[in-house]
Amino acid sequence: MKIAVLGTGMVGNAIASKLVVLGHEVMMGSRTADNAKAAAWTQTTGARGLAGTFADAAVFGELVFNCTNGASSLAALSAAGAANLEGKIVVDVANVLAPNLQASESLGEQIQKAFPRAKVVKTLNTVNCEIMVNPQKLPGSHTVFLSGNDQDAKRMIHELLRTFGWTDTIDLGDIATARATESYLPLWLSLWKQLGTSTFNINVVR
């Protein structure tokens, strides 16, 4: 599959690299066509790794990962182009670092509202980027969540997550449930501080 990964930071690099290892063709998108981080990444991937602007990547990808900083995600997706996202699944893994817990909408909801013809699926935003792409880094079973309005889109992402190694996924419901996972961030940050590592996750025992 041709997949766009928007964002050149640690998360974008981890997701894009995993997808290439799994055999997908991946274009890493950034604000400029000559982004140094994106260019350096392509040197590690062989022919399946490409780089371009946000818009280039959105045109290229049959599926789009939003791995940008949550505070700039809407601007990045706008640069990608609403027409280029139409009908496509947009996997939103971003968090706003300082979420407004009184806000009426999550970032996932804001993206869905701004791009109503895209199929937004919120997932992977409750773990660090190493665990996102390698859940076996932690022993035992642990859980990842899905939120989105389109059932077929969530089923497809569920299957993609299985190829990442995820065996326990919970579909929370429509995109409004992204508020729950985004609101987990303050607890996640407190746990990171207390444990001295971000390599942890939660297991929903049932």
Regions found by a protein language model. Name each.
Residues 14, 18, 114, 160:
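Rossmann-fold NAD(P)-dependent oxidoreductase module
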Residues 1-44:
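NAD(P)+-binding Rossmann beta1-loop-alpha1 motif at the extreme N-terminus of oxidoreductases
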Residues 143-206:
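Active-site-lining helix/loop region of Rossmann-like oxidoreductase modules
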Residues 33, 95-97, 125-128, 150, ...:
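Glycine-rich beta-alpha junction loops
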Residues 46-89, 93-98:
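Rossmann-like NAD(P)-binding element
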Residues 51, 119-125, 169-172:
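General beta-strand structural signal in soluble alpha/beta enzymes
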Residues 23, 60-62, 115-118:
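Short, well-ordered alpha-helix to beta-strand connector turns
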Residues 94-137:
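Rossmann-fold NAD(P)-binding glycine/threonine-rich loop
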